[in-house]
Amino acid sequence: MNITFIGSGYVGLVSGIIMGYLGHNVTCLDNDEVKISKLNKQILPIYEAKLDEYLKQALEANRLKFTNIYNNELQNAEAIFITVGTPSKESGEADLKYVYDAIDKVSEHINKDCLIVIKSTVPPDSCSNIIAYLKSKGFSFNVASNPEFLREGSAVEDFLYPDRIVVGVNNKESEEILRKIYAPLIEQGAKFVVTDLVTSELIKYASNSFLATKIAFINEMADLCEKIGGNIEDLSKGVGLDQRIGQNFLNAGPGFGGSCFPKDILALNNLVENHHIDCKILKAVIKSNKQRPSNMVDKIATLLDGDLKGKNIAVLGLTYKAGTDDVRASPAIEIVKILLNKDVYVKAFDPIGLENAKKNLEHKNLLYLDSVAEACKSVDIIVIATEWLEFKELNWQGIYDLVKFPIVIDLRNIIDNEAMKKIGFRYYAVGSKLDVIPAKAGIHYKAR
């Protein structure tokens, strides 16, 4: 089928490339001329495992092209996917200005039988409002909802092997077009969930908010384990092996971040408040997660006798999770900001996200470095803030020889505690008791 994606950000780009790989004729349209120019040279603006391979295959098969021009070629499209951003307003409400801008532009060019598919995350009733908006301008296009459930870092696999494909429609014609588009995935067993427009839109918000709730809950259980001597890793396993609960999103850490969870739970909370529903769970999760980076800094301070001023701290990992270069709403970045406000000197490293971090945060006391060794040299403490595999596989003996004080606080619980202790590190994970030994007790340190 002939498909166009409006917006070549994370969702539009991954979806467009894989749709081209699956055999559709795909056009990805974006206002950013520089981005489009790079894409035509096979230069991806995002990091996503294996995406470059599928980009190459789709281009070589002549099933994918990139443009920044809205023109009458759009008349050939059988479906237009809107995949633009929906950032949060100050109130927490989703801002749909980019969605409506895209609708205005495509409606002037597409044919009357073209299906407009809203893949951007939008509040319930958005599709119905778009239909009414189009009718007010003299258009009668079918509009469908098709939320995405891609996880950054594993988006290619998520698209090719989805848990489910959700579509919201108000007529059979729209459903049949979407079934045809997703036929390659349905044929291999993907569940195709058909519902109404409002429910489809709400499924995305409810899914992300529920997952965010799991993360906030396990983080608070980690705090309890820290106080009473429990083992958060065993607790997560023991709880998660219950099939009613599942093990995913039960990893204690510095909180959730990224472009979806924080934004979507705020939008859902705004929605329920607008309908005069007091959803205490959502408010509690938002509050808990907002406090989490500060709580992590408090733990760091505790390990340094409560005095952070003037300390040199290595922060390993800046992206909100491993497998992506995305630093949006990253807990690691928030932790760095708090440390800088406390007159700490921060030396930061990330294997993929350094450039995005530099665009996001600059400070006279912040150094971005190109290796773990450079970041750890002569520091008072090492903070592991993102769960990159390379941190787990580091030559920690070599790092021990570089640091001023051999203290590691692992906010992702990825390092082997006993192995670190054998080397000589004082190692602390989230959920472990902080048995504080004053830094001035030199017998526990090898001052550099």
Swiss-Prot record:
Pathway recorded for this protein: Nucleotide-sugar biosynthesis; UDP-alpha-D-glucuronate biosynthesis; UDP-alpha-D-glucuronate from UDP-alpha-D-glucose: step 1/1
Protein name, per record: UDP-glucose 6-dehydrogenase
Active site: C260 (nucleophile)
Gene responsible for this protein: udg
Entry binding sites for substrate: E148, F149, L150, R151, E152, K204, N208, F249, L250, N251, A252, G253, G257, K321
InterPro entries documented for this protein: 6-PGluconate_DH-like_C_sf, NAD(P)-bd_dom_sf, UDP-Glc/GDP-Man, UDP-Glc/GDP-Man_DH_C, UDP-Glc/GDP-Man_DH_C_sf, UDP-Glc/GDP-Man_DH_dimer, UDP-Glc/GDP-Man_DH_N, UDPglc_DH_bac
GO biological process: polysaccharide biosynthetic process; UDP-glucuronate biosynthetic process
Pfam families in alphabetical order: UDPG_MGDP_dh, UDPG_MGDP_dh_C, UDPG_MGDP_dh_N
Reaction it catalyzes: UDP-alpha-D-glucose + 2 NAD(+) + H2O = UDP-alpha-D-glucuronate + 2 NADH + 3 H(+)
Family per record: Belongs to the UDP-glucose/GDP-mannose dehydrogenase family.
EC number: 1.1.1.22
Organism of origin: Rickettsia felis (strain ATCC VR-1525 / URRWXCal2)
SUPFAM superfamilies noted in UniProt: 6-phosphogluconate dehydrogenase C-terminal domain-like (SSF48179), NAD(P)-binding Rossmann-fold domains (SSF51735), UDP-glucose/GDP-mannose dehydrogenase C-terminal domain (SSF52413)
GO molecular function: NAD binding; UDP-glucose 6-dehydrogenase activity
